[in-house]
């Protein structure tokens, strides 16, 4: 993301220099999370090697050590660390900076959230048959290439997907291991978050298979699949670690709902017309998958009958790159992209309004304002 950024809402244009905001002062927590991630991966590596010490891998033959290598490679290159940052600011919102209690738990939560996110990305790429992630080959694409290079038997794609499933499972297992040492209240909230995440992914898959294009379903997928698990649930976990009460949690949930919606709607735009140089994904990825997004639900309402027919072919039959590009252009011409941009702007305003509550620590309010801007106007 370029800094500073200029953003426009319905009635005001402001410039936000993220470098001047305290959200860039969560350094201690983020560094501790990264250190714990490294420690966790080192401990996993030690246990893996101890269990497989009797087997010496040959460089010219496929070997189960590739699962461990893929886990380490993927988890050791974290992205924006949004979820650990949200947990940090939830902790600050509940007075964590003043009493200092629960910070160790926030660090464990941050590392667990990042491992869970890695799990979700690896499995999501399998489900979406996506060969790229963060501008690099996805886990199953790497496994497929290795299968072919070393002359493995059977279907390379099926092998690669199976390896990616194992990689994701191991990442999830390590996340749960970290959470297992946390207080019961946090473990219950963690369980709720993971159930909600799986439910959202299931709605995404079923909605695509059913050709769902209604707004109600699209908003529900956005809320449960990405919005809640990116913003509200990490905020909740961090606040609980600092001993937050129900009234503050209600305020943070209000912020989380709107900020999470802004995040999910930006995902909608990036998944269709995002710059591949920033997103690491091909143009029109969500179109080709026929995903039940808010953007495509609005396109159903705005497009002509002929264009709607073309849109519905996506995910059902082969299409050319030129057809995808034409539909992306139509999303702009019809005003759908602009409409989603306005929805994002309104979501940001609503999120910022929630932070005016006197229950929220002033420092957390400033940090969360900066983060919602980062979520809403990011380029990847």
Segments the model singles out, each with a brief description of its role:
Residues 1-113, 118, 122, 127-150, ...:
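Conserved N-terminal diphosphate/IPP-binding helix and adjacent helical/loop segment
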Residues 86, 175, 200, 296, ...:
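Residue-level signal for inorganic ion chemistry
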Residues 93-103, 176-189, 208-220, 236-252, ...:
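Inter-helical turn/loop segments and adjacent helix faces that build the functional surface
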Residues 106-134, 193-198, 228, 232, ...:
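Active-site alpha-helical segments that house and flank conserved acidic catalytic motifs
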Residues 133-168, 211-228, 250, 276-302, ...:
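Divalent-cation-assisted or electrostatically stabilized phosphate/pyrophosphate-binding catalytic cores
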Residues 170-179, 230-241, 256, 348, ...:
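Histidine- and acidic-residue-rich, metal-dependent catalytic cores
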Residues 306-314:
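Gly/Pro-rich interdomain helix-loop hinge
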Residues 325-380:
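Short hairpin/turn module used for nucleic-acid contact or packing/dimerization
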């Amino acid at each position: 993301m370029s800094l500073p950024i200029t953003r426009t809402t319905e009635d005001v244009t402001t410039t936000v220099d993220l470098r001047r905001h305290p959200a860039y002062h969560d350094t201690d927590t983020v560094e501790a999370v990264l250190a714990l991630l490294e420690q966790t991966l080192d401990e996993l590596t030690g246990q893996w090697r101890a269990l497989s010490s009797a087997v010496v891998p040959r460089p010219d033959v496929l070997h189960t050590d590739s699962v461990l290598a893929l886990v380490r490679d993927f988890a050791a290159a974290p992205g924006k660390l949004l979820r650990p940052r949200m947990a940090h600011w939830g902790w600050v919102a509940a007075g964590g900076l003043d009493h200092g209690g629960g910070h160790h738990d926030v660090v464990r939560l941050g590392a667990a959230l990042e491992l869970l996110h890695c799990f979700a990305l690896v499995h999501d790429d399998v489900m979406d048959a996506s060969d790229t992630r963060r501008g690099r080959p996805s886990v199953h694409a790497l496994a497929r290439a290795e299968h072919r290079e070393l002359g493995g038997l059977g279907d390379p794609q099926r092998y690669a997907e199976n390896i990616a499933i194992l990689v994701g499972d191991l990442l999830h297992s390590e996340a749960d291991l970290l959470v297992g040492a946390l207080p019961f209240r946090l473990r219950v909230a963690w369980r709720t978050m993971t159930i909600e995440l799986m439910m959202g992914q299931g709605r995404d898959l079923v909605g695509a298979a059913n050709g769902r294009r209604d707004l109600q379903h699209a908003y529900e997928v956005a809320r449960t699949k990405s919005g809640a698990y990116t913003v509200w649930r990490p905020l909740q976990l961090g606040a609980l670690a600092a001993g937050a009460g129900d009234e503050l949690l209600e305020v943070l949930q209000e912020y989380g709902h709107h900020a999470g919606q802004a995040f999910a709607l930006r995902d909608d735009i990036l998944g269709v017309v995002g710059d591949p140089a920033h997103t690491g994904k091909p143009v029109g990825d969500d179109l080709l998958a026929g995903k039940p997004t808010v953007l495509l639900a609005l396109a159903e309402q705005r497009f002509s009958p002929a264009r709607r027919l073309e849109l519905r072919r996506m995910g059902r039959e082969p299409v050319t790159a030129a057809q995808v590009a034409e539909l992306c252009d139509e999303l702009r011409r019809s005003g759908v992209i602009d409409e989603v941009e306005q929805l994002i702007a309104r979501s940001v305003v609503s999120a910022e309004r929630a932070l005016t509550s006197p229950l929220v620590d002033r420092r957390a309010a400033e940090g969360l304002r900066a983060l919602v801007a980062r979520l809403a106007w990011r380029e990847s």
